[in-house]
Amino acid sequence: MTQPRKLHIKSFGCQMNVYDAQRMVDALAPEGFVETANADEADLVILNTCHIREKASEKVYSELGRLRVAKDEAALQGRRMNIAVAGCVAQAEGAEIIRRQPAVDVVVGPQSYHHLPQLLAEAARGGRALETEFPVDDKFGFLPPPQPDAIRARGISAFVTVQEGCDKFCTFCVVPYTRGAEVSRPVDKIVEDVRRLADNGVREITLIGQNVNAYHGDGPDGRPWPLGALLHHLAKIPGIVRLRYSTSHPRDVDQSLIDAHRDLPALMPFVHLPVQSGSDAILAAMNRKHSADDYRRLVDRFRSANPAIAFSSDFIVGFPGETDEDFAATLALVTQIGYAGAYSFKYSPRPGTPAAELQETVSAAVMDERLVRLQELIDSQQAAFNAAVIGTTVEVLFERAARNPGQIVGRTAYLQPAHVMAAPDIIGQVLPVRIDSLERYSLIGELAAPQQHSGFATRSEDSPQSLPITTGA
């Protein structure tokens, strides 16, 4: 009997890369590969990379240096280790990766990982394999579906890609160059994927795409469907109790998506809606094609449809030309919107993007100071959001055993981790939990008696008031 070959995948960056890594595992399973958590014992190591920020790509080269040593040690033991670089760094840098690190055997872009078996065979013949073209074939049509055992092993929550690529061409962003133009999968293919996941124990689906609300896949009626229509369709699939989506662009939010938040109990009231800056001048320089007030009005529309909605976002500080007044406008926007959480980053010029050519740069010291101020504001809002849950009863979807013996951990509608003492048989269920305390970012509570809920949280008379957030006009 042939011994299985060991595969280790390390992913950097976004949720799409987590999903892509799972599909690479599925693509390589028929070739006899099984996953291992130990890269040093693997026959194949894949670095699934992100190119959004300079630090992310440099981490990849640092990891490749370590893997070169592991590959040499494997050779001394009479064992061959193949190293592959996949994802957006592979797409952007191509053959430069092999030049910088000759230990790499395969370089494959994110639109071609269904070709991994052929590329590995090519490398086994003594060469190096490189594929970073945007192929005309649809990779999803060539990828084998995950096996039932693999689905169950991955837990009760799953990502499903519905859209890839981006046509927005924000001046700071490499995604249109590394992921290509916006492409949407047909509705029936997505439904097929979700039914398979539900049949094997998945209870929560997160629809993902570089610009997920630009979704316009062909529906069963022959017409393009928007994301809102797709969500309505998926909410009917038995077994799926929660739906999410990420990441959204403000320009592509339409009324069907807002209506879905009004109408679908399964659609979680938590929206990741990146804005990047609160300054109209900087938004224009970024080619975002919306103003800060456009964003405020959009938030108001969501909240009018469902007052329980909370938001997270992305922010960049130190974009070329950002003045003190521009940064103050960002702080004002954050204060006015009120976020349950957000990600903030210092601007990092990416080669080949229009912003990388801008001369009016912001000093590193100023960027550092602005990042600290912004993150302190965001952290204070997140702390207030979490503290407001203490003394309430919230619905939690339980996912797995926690690190502490006897504890089970799940997530609220707003992705807050919640821990209770309970038996493992609650995994996969949505149950009411009375929140008693907060430990850093995790909620601690106990199972509550089943009861009817008017929303996603019920408050006692002496509990904190509703979330400390306001909206603009």
From Swiss-Prot:
Co-factor(s): [4Fe-4S] cluster
Residue ranges of the region described as Disordered: 452-473
Known catalytic reactions: N(6)-dimethylallyladenosine(37) in tRNA + (sulfur carrier)-SH + AH2 + 2 S-adenosyl-L-methionine = 2-methylsulfanyl-N(6)-dimethylallyladenosine(37) in tRNA + (sulfur carrier)-H + 5'-deoxyadenosine + L-methionine + A + S-adenosyl-L-homocysteine + 2 H(+)
MTTase N-terminal domain location: 5-125
Domain TRAM: 387-449
GO cellular component annotations of the record: cytosol
Cellular compartments annotated: Cytoplasm
Molecular functions per Gene Ontology: 4 iron, 4 sulfur cluster binding; metal ion binding; N6-isopentenyladenosine methylthiotransferase activity
Co-factor note (free text): Binds 2 [4Fe-4S] clusters. One cluster is coordinated with 3 cysteines and an exchangeable S-adenosyl-L-methionine.
Keywords: 4Fe-4S, Cytoplasm, Iron, Iron-sulfur, Metal-binding, S-adenosyl-L-methionine, Transferase, tRNA processing
Binding site for [4Fe-4S] cluster 2: C166, C170, C173
Amino-acid positions noted as binding [4Fe-4S] cluster 1 in the UniProt annotation, renumbered to this chain: C14, C50, C88
Residues annotated as domain Radical SAM core: 152-384
Superkingdom of origin organism: Bacteria
InterPro entries, sorted: Elp3/MiaA/NifB-like_rSAM, Methylthiotransferase, Methylthiotransferase_CS, Methylthiotransferase_N, Methylthiotransferase_N_sf, MiaB_methiolase, rSAM, rSAM_horseshoe
EC number: 2.8.4.3
Family statement drawn from the similarity comment of this UniProt entry: Belongs to the methylthiotransferase family. MiaB subfamily.
Subunit: Monomer.
Function recorded in the entry: Catalyzes the methylthiolation of N6-(dimethylallyl)adenosine (i(6)A), leading to the formation of 2-methylthio-N6-(dimethylallyl)adenosine (ms(2)i(6)A) at position 37 in tRNAs that read codons beginning with uridine.
UniProt name for this protein: tRNA-2-methylthio-N(6)-dimethylallyladenosine synthase
Underlying gene: miaB
